[in-house]
Curated annotation (Swiss-Prot):
Modified residues (Phosphothreonine): 763, 785, 1040
Lineage, highest ranks first: Eukaryota, Metazoa, Chordata, Craniata, Vertebrata
Subcellular location: Cytoplasm; Cell membrane; Cytoplasmic vesicle membrane; Synapse
SUPFAM superfamilies (alphabetical): SNARE fusion complex, WD40 repeat-like
Record organism: Rattus norvegicus
Tissue and organ distribution: Isoform 1 is detected in heart, brain, lung, liver, skeletal muscle, kidney and testis. Isoform 2 is detected in brain and in testis. Isoform 3 is detected in testis.
Protein name: Syntaxin-binding protein 5
Amino acid sequence: MRKFNIRKVLDGLTAGSSSASQQQQQQQHPPGNREPEIQETLQSEHFQLCKTVRHGFPYQPSALAFDPVQKILAVGTQTGALRLFGRPGVECYCQHDSGAAVIQLQFLINEGALVSALADDTLHLWNLRQKRPAVLHSLKFCRERVTFCHLPFQSKWLYVGTERGNIHIVNVESFTLSGYVIMWNKAIELSSKSHPGPVVHISDNPMDEGKLLIGFESGTVVLWDLKSKKADYRYTYDEAIHSVAWHHEGKQFICSHSDGTLTIWNVRSPTKPVQTITPHGKQLKDGKKPEPCKPILKVEFKTTRSGEPFIILSGGLSYDTVGRRPCLTVMHGKSTAVLEMDYSIVDFLTLCETPYPNDFQEPYAVVVLLEKDLVLIDLAQNGYPIFENPYPLSIHESPVTCCEYFADCPVDLIPALYSVGARQKRQGYSKKEWPINGGNWGLGAQSYPEIIITGHADGSIKFWDASAITLQVLYKLKTSKVFEKSRNKDDRQNTDIVDEDPYAIQIISWCPESRMLCIAGVSAHVIIYRFSKQEVVTEVIPMLEVRLLYEINDVETPEGEQPPPLSTPVGSSTSQPIPPQSHPSTSSSSSDGLRDNVPCLKVKNSPLKQSPGYQTELVIQLVWVGGEPPQQITSLALNSSYGLVVFGNSNGIAMVDYLQKAVLLNLSTIELYGSNDPYRREPRSPRKSRQPSGAGLCDITEGTVVPEDRCKSPTSGSSSPHNSDDEQKVNNFIEKVKTQSRKFSKMVASDLAKMSRKLSLPTDLKPDLDVKDNSFSRSRSSSVTSIDKESREAISALHFCETFTRKADSSPSPCLWVGTTVGTAFVITLNLPLGPEQRLLQPVIVSPSGTILRLKGAILRMAFLDAAGCLMPPAYEPWTEHNVPEEKDEKEKLKKRRPVSVSPSSSQEISENQYAVICSEKQAKVISLPTQNCAYKQNITETSFVLRGDIVALSNSVCLACFCANGHIMTFSLPSLRPLLDVYYLPLTNMRIARTFCFANSGQALYLVSPTEIQRLTYSQETCENLQEMLGELFTPVETPEAPNRGFFKGLFGGGAQSLDREELFGESSSGKASRSLAQHIPGPGGIEGVKGAASGVVGELARARLALDERGQKLSDLEERTAAMMSSADSFSKHAHEMMLKYKDKKWYQF
């Protein structure tokens, strides 16, 4: 990890290092207009990168273990990860360095340690007595493959079975091999000529620790006497063995086999099993053997004091149950319950009241580890209900497609979301509390609310409470509820852009203050939601359909530093002819049978009941145009104060007024340039005869007939001194819009009438999927020539703000900044009606300002700073309940609109300048406004490209945080763009990371590390220092339960459990040393890490000891004061007694 710690050295070179930038600024600005210096508080010492926590279901699980005393659950994965779970909120993630699959886990029960066996034949001992567990020892087997391990309760000797059939014994304290070895050829019959196969089971007799039960894969089971070093009994069965389990009395054991049978054996009757059971086999007539079933992969045999034992197994279904879901079978007495699971069963464990194997087990629950879920079954209630899982393991319920992270949210947000989400909880869970409740919570120093929003492939959105490094689901929204669902594939309209997951979420735009939510889906649809605590029934879902298509012909090389792009026709990535429609043409098709004016999804036309929470405000869909499918949306922004939403794709940009349900702007990217286009692209539509779209303007489709001055510039009639060339260009553009508006007013009305029918006819046309994710399909060259490799310029960033739109502006005004994939930034002015009543009656006037800025690479993020360098968030409308009672009229709703403008601040004078911060794939610029001079510039990367850039608040200041495709995380000060942090963290290995990585305020960040897990990290030095205290503790001192009472007669006649002195048997004195070539001992870093991890714990203990000492001192002081008071009282009493004695000393008794 590398930080700019040499910044202090470089500070001495500030004069020399800044001279070049000063010269550059002097070239950009006249000496009299030099930018004022802003005192920046963030330094490199404020930054440090470290992982915090990992949430979600362990990806590709492979092993399971449970400590019945500490109540801690461990899960191992195929990638070498280790996840530990305690009480809700206590989780831990560890990773084996080798990355080999975990094949088995064994707790040292109530010792705060865990042994993991990996597929690379390595054993590791983990220390769990520290907040970040670490490996204490490792043992690498060199000549044999490890297949099974067993660690008896309260024993330090670990039995290790191998693929060759041998058993080695490891001392878990020193992690060294004992010289005692059980060879396979000594365990089986001497007359047997075949190898018994790998060891699949090892366990000691619950009543006699000197007897070891060894199960071989071939079907042979051996009861080995450890003292005499010979086999007492051998049990043979024709079918392969998968698992073995003891009855607690040690007189019987049960085996599961590959033919779906269970065999129960008496220890002293090795000839044949006492009972053979086929749980799912069909009993045939004439006493014939049942038909074979699928293998029973695992069986457990648990006893109770008050009833029949439990036999619990996985697998064993009959072969004719094709397509049946995986099952867990619970056999209790004469009843058999088959519990179906949603995914394949990896492993399961029965949770029992006692850790002693020689006592009645009293099982109360079963933990079932599935391929993609963790299920806990209550054995004590009828019907075996499941426990409600408190862990955040449902992140992957549907694949995550996008993420957003919000730190320091309004304090009332989480309770509001929780209250509406609580009504969505399922019923029928067990009434008992979650039994895995070990560990203790950390002392969370962070108190600000954090919310994570995840978008999913099925169109659902989940809100998560991420405060204090925990994660809890708050609320789930299903966006697909507003659309009609096809009953089968034949009924599905062939207008989908994608064949699967047509409702998948691509972009989320959320305003925490107003609670307005806007999403963009993969089918080129946008849905706006408003938060409400009241249930409503929407009779007609408001919707708009937008035509957005623009094609170009030729591109000529512009004069200047930027080479031209190579362009291809827009609208379809192939030039193949479009097949004619096979169904009769209707109003939704153009004259030659091509699909036209048809959205990809069909909105429901029936009343929609909307529960409290997020409720649909407006549905916007892009439609097919002339046989061309709409391009997926690449950028989205919403502003609750203005009541506007804007979105763009590779064809252009559209702005919608969601209050008036009207389209305000519908332009191609080329039209934003006007006559300033450096690429001289000539618009052309090959279907002009069918689509009278004008000489360069896309159809401006709006929800209502809008006056022709809708796009008039608010300054076009003013006499303010603008640049004459810019003013002429703007005026020419406005006249062009006005002319086209008049010419096509009838055509717009006709198109709207067509759209209102919302017809969607099937077609054989299949969309091209090569541009499935436009936001990541860009070329990564080192200059603006990256557009050479793409066919169109897409909208990549959108930002609403109140700032200066032109150089000569004297005051800020509402506007929209638009960034494109070729590094161009446009400014669009917004003229909003004054007053809430006028806002709903008069149109919003939208017009390009003529301001164009350029950077290298696609623009990713834009933000604005005031003259003091403070972040200026967009204006917003505070949340109010929108669904007022019916008796209140419309004026009451109008009064509730209280837009809040936070930019510019009230303390800031109108004349003070602002700064626009623009981050692209290659560089960042800080533009001074209104002069539009480049105040600061930083080339972020030359050889790679920025995947995510965010302007975030940290330590009462602001900075730019970037994540590059080469794995570097960087931060820069604002506005000077000084490098503060540059750490190599994670290279871009898949698009999942690029799609989900995001920064948040207060030094937080996250990304989807696997399809099922979210990794959180921090780049704040303060958070890194406090992390140790924030993490939970896995180990807590707990008294080990007392061993079961042997009873008088059992102790007298030897009927109780027999103990074994394993130290004497396996120690070096009696068994010698093992061969050095057999296994290699590797000391782990756990000792050093334990010291580091315990440092803060020691400090805490010292503080608590000091506090206890102070309390003790106070108590001693109080005691001393009380003692002194008692002594004083005693002296006083003594004096009074002496005086009485002197007074009555000479008197006779009768004189009293």
